[in-house]
From Swiss-Prot:
Organismal lineage: Bacteria, Pseudomonadati, Pseudomonadota, Alphaproteobacteria, Hyphomonadales
Residues engaged in binding substrate: L143, V144, S145, G146, G147, D176, G189, N284
Alphabetized UniProt keyword annotations: Acyltransferase, Cytoplasm, Iron, Metal-binding, Transferase, tRNA processing
Residues reported in the UniProt entry to bind Fe cation: H121, H125, D312
Gene assigned in the entry: tsaD
Known cofactor(s): Fe(2+)
Name the record gives this protein: tRNA N6-adenosine threonylcarbamoyltransferase
Length: 365
C-alpha cells in the first residue's frame, strides 16, 4: 500500500488483556491529536482471583467492545464515514480478548469501507511516547510490563532490534506475585509501590540476578523466590513494607544498571540520545527515578508516556495504525489478518534467538 500524506483519522481498538479500550486519533504531519480516548477496566471482575482470568476477560471484552467503540466515536463527534482507517490489536495477548477486538475492528472497517490495520500490541507501547512527545527515531526502548521486559533498539517504524530480555519472569509479573505473597490484592504493582513508600529499602539484601553478567539479559525469578522466603514470616504491615521497599530497590538496581549499559553502547546517530520507557510498569515512580538517573549519567533524555498511556490503551493502537497507514506499510488485505497470541516485535531475530519464559503467558518475544 502506498504512503499517504494527508491528515488521517483512525479508530483504534485494544482488547489484549484486561482493558477494553477505543480511541479516535487524528494524525497529520507526524503529530497525533486525540479526539477521544475511552478505557474500561476489568479490575472488579478479576480482583477476587488475584490475577487476570482469560475466560472472564474474553467475556467482558465481548460485552464491552461495542459499547466502548460507540462511546469513543460519540466523544470524537465523528461518523464512521469520516474515518480513514480502523486499527486493532492483533496480538500478542490473551487470544480470546484479542479475537474480540480484532473481529470488532474488521466488522467496522468492512461495513464502512475503510482499510483495516492489524497492530502489534508491543509496537503500540513502543510508539506510545509519540502520542504526546517529540520523539523522533532512533531511540533506545525499555518495554517493561506484566508480560514483557526487554531492551530494544528502535531504528524506525517497523525496524526493531532486541538487545536483551528477561529470561524468565517479567517485572510486572514479579510485582504481581510479590503482592500475592503478601496478601496485598490485585493489581499487585500499585499495591507494592504504595506500601514500599513506608518501608526501608535496605531492610533485606535481596539478590540482583544477572547484575554482574555481561549483556542486557535479565532474570527476576530468583528475586521472587527470595521474597517468598522473607514473606513467610512477615506478619506486620511494617515488615511487609520493608519487603516491598527492598524488592522494589532490587528491581530498580537491575533495570538502572542494564539501562546504563544499553545507553553506553547505543548509536543515536547525529541526533540526541533518547531513552524511552513504556509499558504498565513505566508508571512506577521509583523505577522512573532510577532510570532517569541512569539516563542523565549517560547524557540521554528519558521519555515516558503519561501515566494513562503506560498501561494498555487504544490511543497507542490508533497511533501505530496511523503511522503504518501514512508510511504505506500496511498489509494489502488487513481483513485477512489473524489473531496471534505470540508476536515478537523483532520477529526475524526472535526466530533466530527465541527467548523462553518471557512472561506469564510464555515466550512472546
Amino acid at each position: 500500500m502506498r504512503a499517504m500524506s494527508k491528515s488521517l483519522t483512525i479508530l483504534g481498538i485494544e482488547t489484549s488483556c484486561d482493558e477494553t479500550a477505543a480511541a479516535v486519533l487524528r494524525y497529520e504531519d507526524g503529530r497525533a491529536t486525540l479526539l477521544s480516548d475511552v478505557i474500561r477496566t476489568q479490575l472488579a471482575e478479576h480482583a477476587p482471583y488475584l490475577g487476570v482470568v482469560p475466560e472472564i476477560a474474553a467475556r467482558a471484552h465481548a460485552e464491552l467492545a461495542d459499547l466502548t467503540v460507540a462511546a469513543a466515536m460519540n466523544a470524537s463527534g465523528l461518523s464512521y464515514a469520516e474515518l480513514d482507517g480502523v486499527a486493532a490489536t492483533a496480538g500478542p495477548g490473551l487470544i480470546g480478548g484479542v479475537l474480540v477486538g480484532l473481529m470488532t475492528g474488521k466488522a467496522i472497517a468492512q461495513a464502512a469501507g475503510k482499510p483495516f490495520i492489524p497492530v502489534n500490541h508491543l509496537e503500540g507501547h513502543a510508539l506510545s511516547p509519540r502520542l504526546s512527545e517529540d520523539c523522533p527515531f532512533p531511540y533506545l526502548l525499555l518495554l517493561v510490563s506484566g508480560g514483557h521486559c526487554q531492551f530494544l533498539d528502535v531504528r524506525g517504524l517497523g525496524d526493531y532490534r532486541r538487545l536483551g530480555s528477561t529470561i524468565d519472569d517479567a517485572v510486572g509479573e514479579a510485582f504481581d506475585k510479590v503482592a500475592k505473597l503478601l496478601g496485598l490484592g490485585f493489581p499487585g504493582g500499585p499495591a507494592v509501590e504504595a506500601l514500599a513508600r513506608n518501608g526501608d529499602p535496605k531492610a533485606h539484601d535481596f539478590p540482583r540476578p544477572l547484575l554482574n553478567r555481561p549483556g542486557l539479559d535479565m532474570s527476576f525469578a530468583g528475586l521472587k523466590t527470595a521474597v517468598a522466603r522473607a514473606s513467610a514470616n512477615a506478619k506486620s504491615e511494617a515488615e511487609k513494607a520493608d519487603i516491598c521497599a527492598s524488592f522494589q530497590a532490587a528491581i530498580c538496581d537491575v533495570l538502572a544498571e542494564k539501562a546504563r549499559r544499553a545507553l553506553e553502547g547505543f548509536d543515536a546517530g547525529a541526533g540526541d540520545k533518547r531513552f524511552v520507557v513504556a509499558g504498565g510498569v513505566a508508571s512506577n515512580k521509583a523505577i522512573r527515578a532510577a532510570l532517569e538517573t541512569a539516563a542523565t549519567a549517560q547524557g540521554a533524555r528519558l521519555i515516558a508516556p503519561p501515566l494513562r498511556h503506560c498501561t494498555d490503551n487504544a490511543a497507542m493502537i490508533a497511533l501505530a495504525g496511523a503511522e503504518h497507514l501514512a508510511a504505506g506499510l500496511c498489509e494489502t488485505d488487513g481483513l485477512a489478518s489473524s489473531a496471534r497470541p505470540r508476536w515478537p516485535l523483532d520477529e526475524a531475530s526472535a526466530k533466530a534467538d527465541p527467548v523462553f519464559g518471557a512472561g506469564r503467558r510464555g515466550a512472546k518475544a
